[in-house]
Amino acid sequence: MAANSSAVSSDGILIGDKLYSGVMISLENCLMAEERCALTPSVVDGIDVNTEIDLRCVGCELVQAAGILLRLPQVAMATGQVLFQRFFYTKSFVKHSMEHVAMACVHLASKIEEAPRRIRDVINVFHRLRQLREKQKSTPLILDQEYVNLKNQIIKAERRVLKELGFCVHVKHPHKIIVMYLQVLECERNKHLVQTSWNYMNDSLRTDVFVRFNPETIACACIFLAARTLEIPLPNRPHWFYLFGASEEDIKEICLQILRLYTRKKADVALLENKVEKRKLFIEEAKAKAKGLLPDGTPRLENAPEFSPSLKNDSPKELKANKPSPLAVHALKNCKRKVDGTKRPTSSSPVNGRVSKGRDSRSGSRSRDQSYSRSQSRSQSPKRRKSQSYSPSSDSKSRSPSRSRSDSPPHKPNHGSYKSTKGHVYGNNSDYKYQGHKRRSRSRSSSPSHSRSRESSDSGKYKKKDHYYRRERSRSYDRVSHRGYDREYHGHSHHRR
């Protein structure tokens, strides 16, 4: 009943009246055709065949050495090498780092074979292998931002391996198959033959035979090669491997691949990485040139040979954009003036109803008109000056705002009858307070008339203030004398009492 309801056809699975597409998951789907193995993505990107073979061998050696340091089982190491070979039949060595993919395959294989290892341990092991390869001193890996970036790259590489392989990561290893076939041939007691066959099988992982042939055929080839090496006779009429479904041509091809592995010279990893890097730069430059860019990504400034800017009708927006800005023109003029050594001409046009005067004519204007003097231009507003000039402070010589802002020394007024002792002290003292202002007035005054105009302007102020202080002093003197008279009178009356 069930057989009638569902039937399998070449187009899919027929269930009832509906035809469903089927997905066949089998290890035979992981095998590569001969044409696909000859034209790999790395060869398409410009890497020669020998360089690609060396890169595959080096990558598988790294996986094997890392598995030994991580104490992984041999099955996990074999799985990692097979995944490495499968991935680089779909992607190129130019676009993907060989070392990063090897780390990802080790980490993925440890989880597949139920012997997981931390990704940090995988990174440390590969770091140690690089130090041994470059003959460097053993130093621990620093956990900085570079380590975090490397960890993220390995995680991304592992996801990429899963995506490219379609999550078909199961590998059938011929280890158990070798033991089973030797039991059929009644040679399982010969430990030397078993171990040699096992060794050939482990060495064949560095080649691409696991991507091209079935594991049963590989097991037969390893037994055949071990028996020939140890000179152990096996049935040959007919050949014993016909019993297990292997052909003589496949056996010979696998044996030749394994023997070529022993005749190859040891590859220089630094030289291989240099070749890959050069090819990568060449491809990037070719892409940039095709897009009309420089190798660093900036656009080219040269025009096309048949392009004429004068023949193109510019729109108003383009004309406005092509017009130079006034700031650029002004900056260009200033640069020309600096080169020529000429001064910037002053404009004679009035600004806000006043004619702007230059720095050279400032001294003459100050001597003729007091309103243009620096002391009045820097002085405060009339209300504030009036409020501060009549402050109760008696030490107005050093704290008056008008005096602190003026650049010339104060003019000593001569009033004849009244002579202050403080004035004599100021006149004879070398540490006069306004001596620093005197130095600054010499350095900042532009002409003698400039300083004389400021002295005349300040003298009027000092005269007015001095009259005020004289009146204040006379009043205070009267009050003091009156108090003294009172004290004297009270004391005299007390004496009389």
Curated annotation (Swiss-Prot):
Alphabetical GO biological process terms: regulation of transcription by RNA polymerase II
Keyword check for Transcription regulation: yes
InterPro entries the record matches: Cyclin-like_dom, Cyclin-like_sf, Cyclin/Ssn8, Cyclin_C-dom, Cyclin_N
Keyword terms: Cyclin, Nucleus, Repeat, Transcription, Transcription regulation
Compartmental location: Nucleus speckle; Nucleus, Nucleoplasm
Primary residence: nucleus
GO cellular component, one term: nuclear speck
Region (Cyclin-like 1): 61-163
Residue segments, region Disordered: 293-497
Comp. bias (Basic and acidic residues): 357-371, 452-461, 469-491
Region ranges (RS): 366-404
Location of the region described as Cyclin-like 2 in the Swiss-Prot/TrEMBL record: 176-260
Biased composition (Low complexity): 388-403
Short name of any one Pfam family annotated for the protein: Cyclin_N
UniProt keyword tRNA-binding present: no
Cysteine pairs bridged by disulfides in the record: none
An example Gene Ontology molecular-function term: cyclin-dependent protein serine/threonine kinase regulator activity
Similarity-based family: Belongs to the cyclin family. Cyclin L subfamily.
Domain comment as written in the entry: Contains a RS region (arginine-serine dipeptide repeat) within the C-terminal domain which is the hallmark of the SR family of splicing factors. This region probably plays a role in protein-protein interactions.
Role of this protein: Involved in pre-mRNA splicing.
Protein name: Cyclin-L2
Native species: Xenopus tropicalis
